[in-house]
Each structure stands twice: as structure tokens, then as C-alpha cells.
């Protein structure tokens, strides 16, 4: 009986160890996103996915040559956004003009992660709808 219990415990420990790596890799923020140099981009919302575990904003913005580029910005989950900023599924709608400040993917792709320090404002009114810069201005 003791041997069977010990074997079960060892099997559980091995399985937990095996899934820990992918879990940490999934949430490996610093390796992929440039926190030291917040990026500012202004664009037009195409889609807002207010879901768990991660919400997302799909938007278009002009690149340096003036061509429209599709962007993806990942946020925290719907529950966290609602608690922190009172967001709902209607907070952003297709056609809304937004300004985003936050970490861009280090590989230069049009991908941002806004689940840490970031700011989102409505471009037309300047109204800030999200700010997680912890009482400091971007880049400080």
C-alpha cells in the first residue's frame, strides 16, 4: 500500500513539473516584450474581444510609409478589466480611434502586451480608459 501511494505521489510530482515549464513560458512577458521602451501607436479598432483568460484589441494603424497595418494588443481577462477599469464588452467598438502606450514585441511585430504597464486613451477626446503605469509616466 505504501509503495502504491509513493508511486502515485511521484507520478503526480513528475506531471506537475512537466506542465510548469509551458505555464511559465506562456506568461513569459519580459523575454518577448520591451518594457524599457514603451511604444505609442494610434489606430482604429477593428475588433474588441472581451474574454477570459485574455482580452484583445485588434486594430489598424499607419506605418511609417502611411500603409495600414493590422495590430494585436493583448490585455488581462474580462473579469480583471471590469474590476480595474469598469470595462464591459461595449467599452471599445469597431471604428473607435485609440492611442495605446505599452510594451511592443521585441521582434518588431505589430503585437503588444497591455496586461502589465500600459495606457489606452480615446484618440478623439483624449479620455483615458486604462492606465496601469503605477503612478508614473511612460518611460520613467
Description of each model-found segment:
Residues 1-5:
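N-terminal secretory signal peptides that target proteins for export/translocation
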Residues 8-22:
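Bacterial N-terminal signal peptides
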Residues 24-39:
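Short boundary/loop segments of OB/S1/cold-shock single-stranded nucleic-acid-binding domains
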Residues 41-45:
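Conserved hydrophobic positions within beta-strands
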Residues 51-62:
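Short aromatic-glycine-enriched beta-strand elements
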Residues 67-79:
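Short, basic/aromatic beta-hairpin or loop at an interaction surface
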Residues 83-100:
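Short nucleic-acid-contacting surface segments enriched for D/E, G, S/T with interspersed K/R
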Residues 105-134:
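OB-fold/S1-family single-stranded nucleic acid-binding modules
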Amino acid at each position: 500500500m505504501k509503495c502504491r501511494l509513493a508511486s502515485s505521489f511521484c507520478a503526480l510530482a513528475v506531471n506537475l513539473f512537466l506542465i510548469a515549464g509551458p505555464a511559465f513560458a506562456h506568461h513569459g512577458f519580459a523575454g518577448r516584450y520591451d518594457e524599457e521602451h514603451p511604444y505609442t501607436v494610434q489606430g482604429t479598432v477593428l475588433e474588441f474581444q472581451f474574454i477570459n483568460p485574455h482580452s484583445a484589441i485588434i486594430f489598424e494603424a499607419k506605418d511609417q510609409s502611411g500603409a495600414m497595418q493590422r495590430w494585436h494588443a493583448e490585455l488581462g481577462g474580462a473579469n480583471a478589466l471590469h474590476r480595474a477599469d469598469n470595462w464591459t464588452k461595449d467599452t471599445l467598438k469597431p471604428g473607435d480611434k485609440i492611442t495605446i502606450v505599452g510594451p511592443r514585441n521585441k521582434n518588431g511585430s505589430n503585437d503588444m502586451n497591455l496586461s502589465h504597464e500600459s495606457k489606452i486613451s480615446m484618440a478623439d477626446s483624449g479620455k483615458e480608459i486604462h492606465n496601469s503605469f503605477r503612478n508614473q509616466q511612460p518611460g520613467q
